[in-house]
């Protein structure tokens, strides 16, 4: 089945591409060096995993997806390439926020105007139904830039961004496959394979990070899949298994809830404290879980399972309609955050800060390296 072929191609390309990327990054001393106050790793780690993810994704899509099944393919690849190049340059030498946001807005306009993939209907949320063209473009651009940055900001501990990305892409692969949109299902499963291949090296002990070149692209593909799903479910009947999707906005919010809620939360707190919303701190959800003494793996698992439970809730409560379901999801997220805040206030522990050294100081082998060793032995 082509779906399986695309998945395995993406996965294997990443698995075999990352070791030489790590070797080159170590040789050229291209590392992720966090600020002193925010160190949570034992060593400086290469952050070019996005190179393997994006390359495998593009290769699999270009090789296996006919243009007839995905008419937007060239525009999607072009827009994704903008973010990949900007992210890669930022990973290597750093870029000003103005340049990064400029690239993100250019990327969003390509999707909203040239590709004509737009959020067109809010289904009564805030009293808004079908929007005119200009309002639709404006909202779409804001949402794209917001979600792209949300995934960029959630990429703070081992495995988190990639695990959430797997959950997002698998959900949409299933939905598009059921809806008969095979090209979009192929695109989503290509991303799934690339991310799982990357996770072999990103689960603790992480050997590589995806970097901005990976997280920006991940956020971009996730939000494009979301917008396409909204358009599709507005135009035709779609089911999640046997459950008819009648509250599509609620389902999309549930799929993206952890990165979106976390970003809105930290931005709000920073502004309430009279700081720039773009000032880096250690107040993200994953940092808060680490402060309870949880490991990276435990924190990643909790957040990914929580996000998945929101999706299950959204699917189960489709009968509520968009306005009520969106309100319930937001209320649940706020209450959960409040309970976490109370729990942290009682059981907080200091986050252990490990010494950062140049190069791979920790000798444990990642799962991906163990797999490659087994293959070479055979």
Feature map (PLM): residue ranges:
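A generic, lipid-embedded transmembrane alpha helix
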Residues: 45-62, 109-114
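Membrane-embedded alpha-helical core segments of multi-pass
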Residues: 81-82, 86, 103, 107-118, ...
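Transmembrane alpha-helix boundary signature
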Residues: 59-71, 89-95, 112-126, 232-236
């Amino acid at each position: 089945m082509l779906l399986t072929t695309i998945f395995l191609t993406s996965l294997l390309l990443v698995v075999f591409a990352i070791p030489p990327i790590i070797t080159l990054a170590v040789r050229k001393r291209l590392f992720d060096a966090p600020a002193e106050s925010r160190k949570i790793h034992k060593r400086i780690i290469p952050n070019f995993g996005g190179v393997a993810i994006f390359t495998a994704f593009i290769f699999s899509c270009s090789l296996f997806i006919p243009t007839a099944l995905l008419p937007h393919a060239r525009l999607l690849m072009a827009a994704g390439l903008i973010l990949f190049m900007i992210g890669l340059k930022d990973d290597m030498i750093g870029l000003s926020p103005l340049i990064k946001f400029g690239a993100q807005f250019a990327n969003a306009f390509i999707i909203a105007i040239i590709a004509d993939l737009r959020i067109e209907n809010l289904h009564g949320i805030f009293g808004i139904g079908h929007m005119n063209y200009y309002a639709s473009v404006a909202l779409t651009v804001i949402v794209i830039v917001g979600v792209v940055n949300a995934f960029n900001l959630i990429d703070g501990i081992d495995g988190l961004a990639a695990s959430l990305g797997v959950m997002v892409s698998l959900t949409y692969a299933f939905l598009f496959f059921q809806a008969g949109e095979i090209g979009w299902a192929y695109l989503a499963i290509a991303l799934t394979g690339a991310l799982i291949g990357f996770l072999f090296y990103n689960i603790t002990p992480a050997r590589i990070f995806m970097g901005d070149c990976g997280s920006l692209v991940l956020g971009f593909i996730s939000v494009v899949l979301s917008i396409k799903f909204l358009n599709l479910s507005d135009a035709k009947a779609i089911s999640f298994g046997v459950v008819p999707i009648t509250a599509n906005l609620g389902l999309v919010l549930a799929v993206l809830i952890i990165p979106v809620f976390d970003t809105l939360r930290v931005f709000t707190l920073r502004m309430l404290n009279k700081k720039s919303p773009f000032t880096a701190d250690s107040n993200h959800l994953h940092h808060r879980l680490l402060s309870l003494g949880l490991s990276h793996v435990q924190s990643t698992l909790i957040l990914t399972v929580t996000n998945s439970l929101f999706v299950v809730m959204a699917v189960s409560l489709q009968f509520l309609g968009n306005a009520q379901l969106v309100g319930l999801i937001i209320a649940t997220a706020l209450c959960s955050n409040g309970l976490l805040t109370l729990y942290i206030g009682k059981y907080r522990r200091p986050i252990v800060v490990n010494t950062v050294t140049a190069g791979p100081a920790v000798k444990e082998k990642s799962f991906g390296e163990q797999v490659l060793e087994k293959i070479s032995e055979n």
